[in-house]
A protein has these predicted regions:
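Structural motif
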Residues: 29-34, 70-74, 114-121, 170-177, ...
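Short loop/turn segments that connect beta-strands within beta-propeller blades
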Residues: 37-40, 77-80, 124-126, 180-183, ...
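Surface loop/turn motifs at the tips and blade-to-blade linkers of beta-strand repeat domains
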Residues: 5-7, 46-50, 87-91, 136-146, ...
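Recurrent small/Gly-Pro-centered beta-turn motifs in extracellular repeat architectures
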Residues: 27, 67, 108-110, 163-166, ...
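Hydrophobic beta-strand positions that form the internal "hydrophobic ladder"
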Residues: 21-23, 63, 106, 161, ...
Length: 242
């Protein structure tokens, strides 16, 4: 497995009689979108593509990912029906994405040659098809020099994003909170000398918090301002089960 899907769904209470959690993941070669339920010996292939990105489970229990082919947006419904649409990205590649809590806006990390920028698009469904359109760059202040290279993104609320970024290729990747209108970026703390590899949003009853995975396998939970709590070590992927 290369990456595991995260979800917008707040986690329910688990009882001893609850069925095993359902996981969605991208295969190690990034060519298959997989689903598996804990306790089962069967792994189901939901969709295939090229260089599939970390998927996300939406509130309607559909699963969304991107393929580098063309490029293509892939959504698999809760009934197993697959919808795919070629997206006009103007020659860019999607390296990461996150769907907003409203299930309409999608934050995108867009690779343009050697640069990576942040964009936002609108998701819509019409007549059994899914579309991503009106993609625009999220403007960042010229003072936000540490965000010249963005590597990952997750929604913290309807108006706030957590992004991982650095100033130069050889720099350390750290987390920032930004407002979607691009009015400013706020550092969420220099955690360690090790770069952050991935960020996901953790839905809770009190709101949403960021969880980041460091390149050394340390998993950290954002609790307040500059405070981060270590959860685990030796981790290779981070997600929230659906």
């Amino acid at each position: 497995v290369a990456e595991v899907a995260s979800t917008q769904l707040t986690m329910p209470m688990i009882s001893p009689r609850s069925p095993g959690a359902i996981w969605h993941a991208v295969s190690a070669d990034r060519r298959s979108l997989l689903t598996w339920q804990e306790g089962s010996e069967d792994i189901q292939v939901l969709a295939t593509g090229v260089n599939l990105r970390r998927p996300q489970v939406l509130r309607d229990h559909s699963i969304m990912t991107f393929s580098d082919t063309d490029p293509t947006l892939i959504v698999v419904g809760s009934d197993g029906a697959r919808m795919s649409t070629v997206v006009d990205l103007g020659g860019c590649r999607v390296t990461s994405f996150s769907v907003a809590p409203d299930a309409v806006r999608v934050a995108l990390v867009l690779e343009r040659g050697k640069t990576r920028a942040l964009g936002i698009g609108l998701l819509s469904r019409q007549e059994g098809a899914v579309h991503l359109s009106h993609i625009t760059d999220i403007p960042l202040s010229s003072s936000d020099v540490n965000l010249s290279i963005i590597t990952d993104v997750a929604w913290l609320s309807q108006t706030r994003l957590c992004v991982l970024g650095r100033a130069i290729d050889a720099g350390v990747t750290t987390p920032y909170e930004i407002v979607v209108d691009g009015s400013g970026a706020t550092s969420m703390g220099q955690l360690t000398a090790t770069s952050m590899a991935a960020v996901v949003a953790l839905p809770t009853e009190m709101g949403t918090e960021a969880v980041v995975l460091c390149e050394d396998g340390t998993l950290l939970l954002h609790e307040e301002s500059f405070r981060w709590r270590q959860i685990l070590q030796g981790v290779s992927a981070v997600a929230v089960t659906a």
